[in-house]
Amino acid sequence: GAIFDVDGTLLDSMGIWKDVGVRYLNSIGIEAEPDLGTILFTMSIQEGAQYVKEHYHLSQETDEIEQNVLDIISDYYKETAPLKSGAVELLEKLRNSNIPMTIASSNNKKEIEMAFERLEIAKYFDRIFTCEEAGAGKTKPDIYLQAAEYLGSRPEETLVFEDVIHAVRTAKKAGFQVIGIYDEASKDDQEEIQREADCYCRDWRELMKKKTALTIAGSDSSGGAGIQADIKTMQANGVYAM
């Protein structure tokens, strides 16, 4: 089976999480400090709303700020969030190889469903798993293990596609085969992702250019052995850097 992250992996959407504070302040006629996006990026929405209220001396209540920020994010996924180049071709190839797929995301299910409906890719996934439902973030393997159990696929037989280092490490330690994908928001961590992941690619089109095994597990009964052999083929073909 295959488990996909969403933001930064399938969708080129990480930028909204750095821009949303600026967008909110602009909407109420306030100019944001240049590094606001970086400051808010590591905060929860609740923490960010409190920071903005206090730092910019806003009269709005924190709950109102939080809801306005959530509305901006929701509109972005409903109307704008784009697919990464080559994503549909990859999903189509996996589906044609009879490989079941699920989503494992830190985002809200509502935003994912809206974006997937607009982009017409919901059909590729059997289910969407979220960290909120799993009861833990991606520093713990719960969401991956739940997704694999749903797929009926052991970790060693399952590919996990991720773009951030902490998620790559978590999935790898849990026994999954991890493919790292480049994203601009995580560019400072790319060397670590290359070292930690089983395989790594700059983009999905790079992967699709090579004769690799996206015919992998799920198309037959070879299971983990099939994936292991195919990952070695990918590495040998130079698609990925370890």
Where are these regions (language model features)?
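Conserved SAM-binding loop
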Residues: 10, 83, 101-104, 160-161
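Small-residue (G/A/S/T)-rich helix-start motifs and N-terminal tracts that mark the onset
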Residues: 209-242
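Conserved beta-strand elements of the Class I
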Residues: 1-4, 159, 212-214
